[in-house]
Amino acid sequence: DSAKAFEKEGAQVNLVPFVTIDEEAIVKSVDKMVDNIVNSDIIFFAGGFSAADEPDGSAKFIVNILLNEKVRAAIDSFIERGGLIIGICNGFQALVKSGLLPYGNFEDASSTSPTLFYNDANQHVARMVETRIVNTNSPWLAGVTVGDIHAIPVSHGEGKFVVTAEEFARLRDNGQIWSQYVDFDGQPSMDS
């Protein structure tokens, strides 16, 4: 679905699976990933399942790939030249766990690092929710306006973004929060 959406908007998409069947396949996958990063303007990390979808299972796997010396160097160069990175589902979770979000570079996780945690319902949630755009300080938000409300699908078990009050204030003040959940009357809500 994501590849089709990018293609619909005129992007040339290269799907790059990471093969782990043996050590040789992993080495080839790293090299192919690096070659694609070097020749890309956008990197998109999709979601997926691994390890019986244990808590952040695929995200931990993706982070290990991102921390590979060659991949990390390629991503650092990619960021320096202004490349765009986005992730959904476990791909987003991996960006948070690696520090690429919200810091824009690799950061070691600490006890106060932002993270994704179990929903308040403590179970998988799949439904439509409403969000309001509160900031358009990103190329990803071209064509939307502050105040726009969008109905979007969510499907997650670990969809709660947890951050300290100080970090929240920093993200807000830096213009890094671009939407908030709202109820059907457009009022801010913690119900995701």
Q: Where are the regions a protein language model picked out?
A:
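C-terminal and late-domain segments of enzyme folds
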Residues: 4-7, 128, 133-192
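N-terminal beta1-alpha1 cap of cysteine-dependent amidohydrolase-like domains
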Residues: 1-88, 92-105, 111, 117-125, ...
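Intrinsic disorder/low-complexity segments enriched in polar/small residues
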Residues: 108-109, 131
